[in-house]
């Protein structure tokens, strides 16, 4: 799926429409704990989070994530959208819960980005 498909599956609003949303999404990670995001994600991972502060964009930038989906209908300040655009990190917004958002993406074939004992299937393909 690309980010346009993700937006469609999640009934999401695209908050950074000037960015390229044709990039492919292979795996996703849902978290509000940014230390977990840094520890367990791989480049190009799609992050689903309820966080709406600038640290979520800075973390996505450091981890080279493929985009951010703000869940639970949390209000996103314009400054967060501007920072995401400046960092070239696609930002989407949905009223769905984290649980339902992750479930819809999983049903659509997006893989989880978690470590499985003895398996390297959690690694997102290089894009």
Residue ranges and their predicted role:
Residues 125-127:
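Feature 3881 marks metal-assisted phosphotransfer/nuclease machinery
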Residues 11-18:
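Short secondary-structure junctions
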Residues 22-23, 27, 31-46, 50-123:
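Feature captures the catalytic cores and cofactor-binding loops of soluble hydro-lyases/lyases
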Residues 1-4, 97:
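Short, structural beta-strand-to-alpha-helix junction motif
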């Amino acid at each position: 799926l690309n980010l346009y498909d993700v937006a469609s599956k999640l009934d999401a609003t695209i908050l950074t429409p000037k960015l390229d949303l044709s990039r492919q999404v292979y795996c996703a990670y849902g978290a509000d704990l940014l230390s977990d995001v840094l520890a367990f994600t791989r480049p190009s991972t799609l992050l689903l989070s309820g966080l709406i502060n600038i640290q979520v964009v800075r973390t996505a930038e450091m981890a080279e994530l493929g985009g951010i989906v703000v869940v639970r209908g949390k209000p996103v300040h314009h400054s967060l959208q501007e920072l995401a655009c400046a960092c070239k990190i696609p930002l989407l917004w949905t009223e769905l819960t984290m649980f339902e958002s992750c479930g819809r993406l999983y049903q659509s074939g997006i893989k989880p980005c978690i470590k499985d004992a003895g398996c390297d299937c959690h690694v997102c393909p290089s894009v």
